[in-house]
Amino acid sequence: MGLSSTDKKDRRNMLFAAIPSICASSPKKISIYNEEMIVARCFIGFLIFSRKSLGKTFKETLDGRIESIQEELQQFFNPKQVIPGESNEQQRLLRISLRICSAVVESLPTAACAPKCEKTVQALLCRNLNVKSATLLNATSSRRIRLQDDIVTGFHFSVSERFVSGSTFKASTVEQIREAFVPIDLIREGLIVLRKV
């Protein structure tokens, strides 16, 4: 019985793997078996003997992955493609189960309490909104009072600084009056802004 071409290649590879161990010899023609040579021969032998089985396994895995990727790409580029019968059946069963679930939920005793719960939730939300709006109004009114106090204090300070007797600041009376009206304009603008708020 003759050897196939792959068997011949395997034997040739084994011969090439054995050559380094034969060549690695001492001057006295004694073969040296160090750890590196043993590891190298074991690795080469593993590659030779496992090439067939591992190659087939990797090839089958890669072929399956390639096919699944191609199917996904076809579905991605052709979304209007006809859906197989199995998926139609699954969708039909899903619709039926959803109908059953909704019927079961509606028949539960808690479903009868849903309108009352809805009214209670609405009442709570309205109460919370009223509390927050009242708090906001109180905060804005207190800020308005504080802003008016700050503006009046600044106005008194700037006017008293300008008109205090013995002031070294030399400016005309018209300029001093104009500068005194600036805080009044600020008060008006602040009140307008606060009314808008």
From Swiss-Prot:
Ranges annotated as spanning the membrane: 30-50
GO CC annotation terms, alphabetical: mitochondrial membrane; mitochondrion; proton-transporting ATP synthase complex
Membrane-related topology note: Single-pass membrane protein
Superkingdom: Eukaryota
InterPro entries xrefs: ATP_synth_Bsub_B/MI25, MI25_plants
UniProt entry keywords in alphabetical sequence: ATP synthesis, CF(0), Hydrogen ion transport, Ion transport, Membrane, Mitochondrion, Transmembrane, Transmembrane helix, Transport
Pfam families according to UniProt: Mt_ATP-synt_B
Cell compartments where the protein resides: Mitochondrion membrane
GO BP term, pick one: proton motive force-driven ATP synthesis
Main localization, broad class: mitochondrion
GO molecular function, one term: proton transmembrane transporter activity
Function: This is one of the chains of the nonenzymatic component (CF(0) subunit) of the mitochondrial ATPase complex.
Subunit note: F-type ATPases have 2 components, CF(1) - the catalytic core - and CF(0) - the membrane proton channel. CF(1) has five subunits: alpha(3), beta(3), gamma(1), delta(1), epsilon(1). CF(0) has three main subunits: a, b and c.
Family of the protein in this entry: Belongs to the ATPase protein MI25 family.
Name under which the protein is recorded: ATP synthase protein MI25
Organism encoding this protein: Oryza sativa subsp. indica (Rice)
